A protein has these predicted regions:
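Feature captures the catalytic cores and cofactor-binding loops of soluble hydro-lyases/lyases
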Residues: 32, 42-59, 159, 163, ...
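N-terminal glycine-/serine-/threonine-rich phosphate-binding loop
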Residues: 2-30, 35-37
Length: 270
């Protein structure tokens, strides 16, 4: 893809923060498609209508796995046989505030109901005209799809981690590829970003671990160490950090890394 037409992830995040749609493209070896993406809390009837009129693809609602559990939404297919499986749940509709459910206003109402933390499964019904997708925990670092990219962008831009996406199709019904997406971008003044760049951004600048436990521990003849346990937000693995003294003064600190073999530990325990 010609670099001059690609915006930085920082620019993409800024537009998402300001309620502007962006186009995200995935790898040519994958779907090789571009999706319109907008944080769900920024979506109104005008946004839905734009996606339906100009995007032309299926309008979907990527949600975190935790939100899907809160809404008690089962997967559409238990045995997903897609080439690049997308986790569709059953379709939904807001229980109140809609008519037939298909209008731009009705779909916007359903979207806002689904992401409202004060709403629960009793506030939606199925089937409907909005198609939730389950984003993998860990985002694009686990699965480099539009579902995960859109939720990552919503979170990184300070919005509720939920998004609305729509594949872009050409006038003749074929899928829009890079040359078509560039023309679409220029016509509608919408920035283009790449999922591969979002992956790099997250690896470099995003916080991918969280502190879960900290305390003191006596080791090696009663020498006291600070103990901290960090959990990966990507794959839930844990890392144990032992430190002694002040390691935050900017001075170089010797670091040793030990790979723990649980098989070896169990062998010694027996």
């Amino acid at each position: 893809m010609t670099a001059e037409f690609i915006s930085s992830i920082e620019e993409i995040i800024e537009d998402q923060k300001n309620g502007k749609m962006v186009i995200m493209v995935d790898d040519e070896s994958r779907e090789n498609e571009g999706d319109l993406i907008l944080p769900a809390e920024k979506v109104d009837d005008k946004a839905v209508n734009f996606m339906a009129k100009y995007g032309r693809g299926l309008i979907c609602l990527p949600l975190t796995a935790s939100r899907v559990r809160e809404l008690n939404l089962p997967l559409m297919a238990q045995n997903n046989q897609e080439r690049d499986p997308t986790a569709f749940t059953i379709s939904i509709e807001a229980k109140e505030g809609v008519t037939t459910g298909i209008s731009a206003q009705d779909r916007a109402t359903t979207i806002q109901t689904a992401i409202d933390k004060n709403k629960c499964e009793n506030d939606i019904t199925s089937p409907g005209h909005v198609f939730p997708l389950v984003a993998r925990d860990g985002g694009v670092l686990v699965r480099a799809g539009h579902t995960e990219a859109s939720v990552d962008l919503a979170r990184l831009s300070g919005n509720i981690p939920a998004s609305v996406i729509c594949e872009i199709m050409n006038d003749d019904g074929t899928m829009a590829r890079v040359p078509d997406l560039i023309k679409f971008s220029q016509k509608h003044q919408i920035k283009i970003g790449r999922i591969v760049d979002l992956i790099s951004y997250r690896l470099e600048k995003d916080t991918n671990i969280k502190l879960t436990h900290e305390g003191k521990i006596d080791l090696m003849q009663e020498n006291e160490f600070d103990l901290k346990i960090y959990e990966s937000l990507v794959d839930k693995t844990e890392q144990i950090v032992l430190s002694k003294g002040d390691v935050s003064n900017g001075e170089p600190v010797m670091v040793r890394v030990y790979a723990v073999s649980y098989t070896h530990l169990r062998a010694h325990e027996t």
